[in-house]
Amino acid sequence: MLSIIICDDDQTINHQLLPIIQQYLEQKKIPAAIQQYTDAKKLLEDMPLFDIMFLDVEMPEENGIEVAKAFRKQSNWGQIIYLTNYAQYAQTAYSVHPFGYLTKPIDEENINKILEEALEYLEKKSPHHQFGVMTDTGIK
């Protein structure tokens, strides 16, 4: 089962992102567990394993880049997709090898595209990720 984390201090973003991800996974028939966090400290306390994490860069108390570094130190190499209002963080964000960097506001088409790319990457990288992705041309 695919494990996805959404971490953004803005609950509005979490509430916008969750149904987009759920709908995408439902259409592709991919089972997943999705965890939501609005507090980066709680995320760091829990330190859950994940396949894909949507992570805000600018949060109170904890910076998303520092959160990602903490996960990397624990050898968690899931795919991190940054969400932010601040494009200037892109250079620094790449120090933890994120899979993607999306600017807000949330765009469903961009979310779906990066989800598809991340799932294809995970499937190629790890044989135990065999979930197949339904596209317009069939199952990949």
Describe the residue ranges of each PLM region.
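Conserved sequence signature across two-component system core domains
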Residues: C7-D8, Y37, M53
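Two-component/phosphorelay signaling modules centered on CheY-like receiver
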Residues: Q11-Q35
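Short, Lys/Arg-enriched segments at the junction into DNA-binding effector domains
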Residues: L119-K140
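Acidic di-acidic motifs
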Residues: D8-D10, N85
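Helix N-cap/capping motif at the beta->alpha junctions
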Residues: Q36-K42, G64
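CheY-like receiver
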Residues: E45, F50-K125
